[in-house]
Amino acid sequence: MSTLGRYRHVVKLGEGTYGMVYKGTEIQTGRVVAFKRMVVTSDDEGIPGAAIREICLLKELRHNNVVELFEVLFDPPKITMIFELCDCDLKRYMESRPQRLLDANTEMRPILKQIFLGLEYLHGRCVVHRDMKPQNIFVNVRGPDFAAMTALPSSPQQSMRVPHAGGTNGEAGRASANGNEHAPRPTAAEGSVSPWEEAANTKDAPNQLIIKIGDFGLARVEEIPVKKYSHEVVTLWYRSPDVLMSSALYSYPVDIWSMGAIFFEMATSKVLFSGRNEDEQLLRMFWLLGSPTKETWPSMMTYTGTMERLERSSRAAAERQDLTVNGDVYVQQQQLQAQQQQPQQGSSPSHSSSRAPDLLTQLAHKRFYHSESAMQQRRESASSAANSYRLPVELWFDRPLFKEYMAATRCDVSVSPEGIDLLRRCLMYEPNQRITAAEAVHHPYLERVPVPTAGSLDVLISSLMQTMETIHLL
């Protein structure tokens, strides 16, 4: 079946991982949708495996906080998946807020709880998302009237639906220049403010935020046996340490680690681990959380890529150490690079964490590299029994920077001690020691947070608002 003659006001939103994504209005119903179109060429061996996985998964998923797939159209050589269009993705929503910071009670906690509710549903059905990041989480913004009507305590039995989205999967985790593939991004030339942005910036009363998890192109069903999972999953900044070690059998905890990184980003507007490559990413984890031991990460040596990754990260750390005979030198270099990377006036700002001086690097070099005595202390500690894995001194950091970094970024002020506890439980080295999605929903930081329950009503309102916007009534 073809989309020809079924849609009007068709606009290209961007290019997803496996095809083009468009926005259009159904002529018969007036419903505004996003549709992802893939073309299978004669050179292909068939429909891409990721597309098959996404179609199969989405056809079975029905939940308030998980994208709904409306329809799949087959018109050889094209395959078109029809989704509901959301207002924006979480990354863009955060960028729209003052100083890119979210209010803890009216924004951050409700968003966080709904994401965990979505993950609880997915994990309960043996689905591992494998690419959790702000670009794959979607937001519908509803005004105070809608909020007052629908804000009720959450129930474990929720059965709604909505959006889909994507973004790119670049190595450093940067957003695609095209923006999100199912959330429209007005160009500067349009110069208009969308209805959701007006609602988001109202000061009269809190809005209702409805959150959806999307983009299941990398998802896996846990019960289906496979020879080995690819470790090239989860955009680098949100990738768990076990995936960095090339774990072949990772499961639900990879999503939980990503949630810890997303949580921190919502609280501070900064990326938690902004490594330029996998070796630097692991080093930053060791700085923040302390180097792993047999107690904190008992399964570390069971992963196929552990030894190679440790060797590579050790070399990267040694290069940094050579630069810091005087510990201030490296920090000064970092600050100079940050100033040089500042966007020119009139250009689009990049992520705040990529422009601001790297606080984690500054703290690490002040504690671990600043003086010969600091490095000598590390050498002595690395030779002690505490270093149960006998890690090289370049990778041995026995005094975690977690507490200092939470204070330096004001994360501890933004989220309270209970929030810090939830964050830390997401960021455990050992996968089985991480909090589960079901446990997170009932964590003291989230347990009493109300979430929207008017699922089908939101679908109707979302479609109506987007249709009116399309025909310039809003």
From Swiss-Prot:
ATP binds at residues 13-21, 36. The modification Phosphoserine is found at residue 230. It is an enzyme of class 2 (transferase). Its cofactor is Mg(2+). It catalyses: L-seryl-[protein] + ATP = O-phospho-L-seryl-[protein] + ADP + H(+); L-threonyl-[protein] + ATP = O-phospho-L-threonyl-[protein] + ADP + H(+); [DNA-directed RNA polymerase] + ATP = phospho-[DNA-directed RNA polymerase] + ADP + H(+). SMART domains: S_TKc. Residues 7-446 form the Protein kinase domain. Residues 150-200, 334-356 are annotated as: Disordered. Keywords: ATP-binding, Cell cycle, Cell division, Cytoplasm, Kinase, Magnesium, Metal-binding, Mitosis, Nucleotide-binding, Phosphoprotein, Serine/threonine-protein kinase, Transferase. One of its GO terms (cellular component) is cytoplasm. It comes from the Eukaryota. Belongs to the protein kinase superfamily. CMGC Ser/Thr protein kinase family. CDC2/CDKX subfamily. This is Cyclin-dependent kinase 2 homolog. It comes from Crithidia fasciculata. The gene is CRK2.
